[in-house]
């Protein structure tokens, strides 16, 4: 999957696109231009990846179980390929923060909460955190573990909880249609 990089130094900011968008969405919508002072001054290095939403939760022809399987493949791609790519492009001690809006917020929140040992924080903007509305009533363990509204209240692993507490999490919401 394609990935785009902006900047040379600073903490790593991994951007996940909204709904059915791609890795260049934030450039097209001028968000990269707004971040330019931080990118150009070496405060952050931005990475943006493609989404798989049309191959999973937003694909109405796909069964719920297959949507969850595809989501897990995306999660593993981020953890096993994108995070090492970012670490190689920065340094192994450079913090990684992940952000997105809409479905990108879901991915950002989910990826951080599941692996706070790899991702240091998340900025989740106007996200949907309950995936059951995208599964036509299908619900299993895989849907549960990708739907933060369901699994977080039951999270009891003290090591993971402590890492989440040490991380940074910003949940931003708004009003209106978008």
Residue ranges, per PLM feature:
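Non-catalytic cap/lid and distal C-terminal segments of serine-dependent acyl enzymes
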Residues: 1-178
């Amino acid at each position: 999957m394609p990935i785009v990089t902006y900047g040379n130094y600073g903490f790593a900011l991994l951007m996940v696109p909204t709904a059915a968008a791609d890795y260049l969405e934030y450039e097209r919508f001028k968000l990269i231009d707004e971040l330019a002072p931080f990118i150009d001054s070496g405060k952050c290095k931005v990475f943006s990846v493609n989404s798989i939403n049309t191959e999973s939760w937003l694909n109405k022809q796909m069964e719920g179980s297959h949507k969850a399987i595809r989501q897990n493949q995306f999660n593993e791609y981020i953890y096993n390929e994108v995070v090492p790519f970012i670490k190689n492009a920065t340094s192994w001690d450079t913090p990684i923060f992940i952000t997105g809006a809409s479905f990108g917020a879901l991915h950002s929140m989910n990826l951080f909460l599941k692996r706070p040992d790899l991702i240091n924080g998340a900025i989740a903007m106007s996200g949907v955190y309950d995936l059951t509305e995208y599964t036509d009533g299908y619900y299993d363990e895989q849907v549960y573990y990708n739907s933060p509204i369901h699994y977080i209240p039951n999270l009891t692993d003290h090591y993971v909880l402590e890492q989440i507490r040490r991380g940074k999490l910003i949940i931003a919401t708004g009003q209106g249609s978008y």
